[in-house]
Amino acid sequence: MCTYIITQSFFFLPCLSFLFFKLVGFFDSVFTAGKSLRIMFELPIFDKLTSCFAAIDCSATSLDIPFAEEELFLMLVSEPVLIPFLFVFEFMLICKPCGSRSRFGFPVKNVSDFEETLEFDPTLLV
């Protein structure tokens, strides 16, 4: 009986320690991601990006972002924590409902065409 308990403990202890370290690693990664997200939202550059998103001219044929690509590159070099946010920012630009642009980013002629193309739900438009 004692031998059985010893052999079982040799089998289960590595498994339990492996699971424990996996769990610790998971919570550490979640904490690190949350910490970097908090840092990102406290950056003044985040305010600049959100104001740029709000200032996009919806009547324009293309997305006119109010800062140059060089300035964006300099922001990325100085604040690399913003890189994941920029993917979200780009997705927000594509999905922003603007006049002749649908919320999915493909052009429509007018709202009636949009209603015929997709099931129109006014609550989806911001």
Swiss-Prot record:
Q: Which residues lie on this side of the membrane: Cytoplasmic?
A: 31-73
Q: Which cysteines are joined by disulfide bonds?
A: none
Q: Does the keyword Membrane apply?
A: yes
Location(s) in or outside the cell: Membrane
Provide GO CC annotations from the record.
Answer: membrane
Native organism is Saccharomyces cerevisiae (strain ATCC 204508 / S288c) (Baker's yeast)
Miscellaneous comment in the UniProt entry for this protein: Partially overlaps YBL061C.
- What is the annotated signal peptide range for this record? none
Name this polypeptide is given? Putative uncharacterized membrane protein YBL062W
Query: Which residues span the membrane?
Result: 10-30, 74-94
Ranges facing Extracellular side: 1-9, 95-126
